[in-house]
Design a protein with these regions (language model features):
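N-terminal export leaders
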Residues: 3-14
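Residue-level micro-sites within transmembrane alpha helices that shape
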Residues: 8-9, 110, 179
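Hydrophobic alpha-helical segments, especially transmembrane helices
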Residues: 10-11, 112, 205
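Short, motif-level signal for alpha-helix interfacial/capping segments enriched in acidic residues
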Residues: 17-21, 156-159
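Bacterial Sec-dependent signal peptides at the C-terminal "C-region" and cleavage site
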Residues: 18-31
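Serine-dependent carboxylesterase/thioesterase catalytic core
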Residues: 34-40, 46-47, 51, 55-68, ...
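Helical cap/lid subdomain of alpha/beta-hydrolase-fold lipid enzymes
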Residues: 115-227
């Protein structure tokens, strides 16, 4: 005949069950950050990233495009990073995690934001699309400060690299095309600590319009599939 456990034992069993339930609930997957900051490249406008922003919005995310002014490299990338900071302060609530996607020069401006103003606890995912992380030979054709920052071995590029270790919990992704004639060599768009992907997109400007690239971004930043 089974005996009813004493009240103290029943209480202990109930507490154990409650603790187990709490732990199991705590292991449920976290909802991915909803806010996505999109930073366009040199000579680009907010319209350049319209297709990507629309796809992210359709996936239930909240994209914000940061149109850089001026967008022609006339000022240094560290200065432009302040515009990214201002947009984040306006559109992303304090202490809320978010992701950043930078295209071309915008990827370097976004990295400068991380170095100067970013909080590692808030950056969930960093994606760069055809950004010259190791510089581009094309930058030798202009003496504009922002373009000089994109020259191989520039002081700017040397300054942003050492700060990457602070963002060890951030998911880093780079996407490039081996056919790029703006970022030379195209391998400059990779980072040693990132997951580096390559898609055969015909031209540098088409990277943010190509459906494969847009789908990759949505897949990485959007909510996980149900079931």
């Amino acid at each position: 005949m089974n005996r009813r456990p004493p009240s103290t034992k029943r209480a202990a069993l109930a507490a154990t069950a409650l603790t187990a339930g709490t732990l199991l609930a705590g292991t449920a997957p976290m909802e991915p950050p909803r806010h996505v900051i999109l930073v366009p490249g040199i000579w680009d406008t907010a319209g350049t990233l319209r297709k990507m922003a629309a796809a992210l919005r359709d996936a239930g995310l909240e994209p914000t495009v940061v149109p850089l002014t001026p967008n022609n490299g006339r000022i240094g990338l560290d200065v432009l990073a302040g515009q990214v900071r201002d947009a984040i302060e306006r559109h992303v609530p304090n202490d809320v995690r978010f992701s950043i996607v930078g295209f071309s020069m915008g990827g370097l401006v976004a990295r400068s934001y991380l170095r100067q103003f970013g909080d590692p606890a808030r950056i969930a995912t960093f994606v760069s699309i055809s950004s010259p992380h190791r510089g581009t030979w094309m930058a030798w054709f202009s003496a504009a400060p922002g373009v000089r920052d994109m020259r191989p071995d520039s002081a700017f590029l040397k300054a942003v690299d050492p700060d990457a270790h602070r963002y060890h919990a951030t998911k880093w992704i780079t996407i490039r095309t081996p056919l790029d004639l703006m970022i030379l060599p195209s391998s400059s768009s990779t980072l040693p600590w990132a997951r580096n992907e390559s898609l055969p997109v015909l031209m540098h400007p088409l990277m943010v319009l190509d459906g494969r690239v847009v789908r990759r971004i949505v897949h990485e930043l959007g909510p996980p599939p149900a079931g």
